[in-house]
Amino acid sequence: MNLNYLDFEQPIAELEGKIEELQLVGNSSDVNLADEVAKLREKSTKLTETIYSKLTAWDIVKVARHPQRPYASDYISRVFTEFDELHGDRHFGDDKAIIGGVGRLDGKPVMVIGEEKGRSVHEKVMRNFGMPRPEGYRKALRLMEMAERFKLPVLTLIDTPGAYPGIDSEERGISESIAQNLAVMSRLRTPIVCTVIGEGSSGGALAIGVGDHLNMLQYSTYFVISPEGCANIIWKTVAKAPEAAQAMGVTSKVLQDLGIVDETIPEPLGGAHRNVDEMARKLQERLVEQVEQLSREPIDALLERRYQRLMSYGN
């Protein structure tokens, strides 16, 4: 895979470019450059470690939005088996920005719901760039209520720039659909594990984000408004987005310190897009353990703990 490098990764890109040049020379001649390539690879790894150890909140926002970052569909295909997608909200239509269905996690049946941005131009348009409309959240609600009836744990994968704010979305009740999901998820009689895999923005993320355990991938973000939106409101310019990201505390580390996030799942060096299979394996391991722990708890005790968890926010 040809990596797209972010602005702060340019020194890494230059080193990787030199490695490619040496490999081309070595492949087209009898000169053995393996030692030189190995040295440069080691140097590139150390440089990546140094750069990623000093990321600002704004840098992490960029990583969370990386165009090659794995999406919900990438994790669903790797983490779950026998996945059968279910469609439609039974009211209006089928929103492609929400993927949901029944699958197996370590052989046990679960309900999986994820927000999907789409990779190609065609997919992005079809998925509405990961911005669900009311029918998307109502589809998610239908699947969660189905999971409750069949006693299936619910696993959500959060990755959205926000709920779609268009006129058609407002006409069909986007605020009501989000509010209804929040209310139902808070009392759903089955374990719920939520994971922010990329962008977790505003009510669009919260609509599938209420549960018993909240994970964030190391370089994902979670916020009530985008840093650009915050900067535009406070400073009247998007140029202040880096300062807004820092002030808002959008990273997994800050949110875990505040007690909002339960667990940060480490990513491969350089972000999840550098090694999707490794990231999927780590996510699977954590989800298996978390679902097993929650499933052992009596449902009434689980609901009480979920209620207390929600009531503790802001205290």
UniProtKB/Swiss-Prot annotation:
NCBIfam families: accA, AccA_sub, PRK05724.1
Name of the encoding gene: accA
Keyword Transmembrane helix: no
Keywords: ATP-binding, Cytoplasm, Fatty acid biosynthesis, Fatty acid metabolism, Lipid biosynthesis, Lipid metabolism, Nucleotide-binding, Transferase
Pathway: Lipid metabolism; malonyl-CoA biosynthesis; malonyl-CoA from acetyl-CoA: step 1/1
Location in or out of the cell: Cytoplasm
SUPFAM superfamilies in the record: ClpP/crotonase
Entry similarity comment: Belongs to the AccA family.
GO molecular function: acetyl-CoA carboxylase activity; ATP binding; carboxyl- or carbamoyltransferase activity
Entry EC no(s): 2.1.3.15
Subunit organization: Acetyl-CoA carboxylase is a heterohexamer composed of biotin carboxyl carrier protein (AccB), biotin carboxylase (AccC) and two subunits each of ACCase subunit alpha (AccA) and ACCase subunit beta (AccD).
Descriptive protein name: Acetyl-coenzyme A carboxylase carboxyl transferase subunit alpha
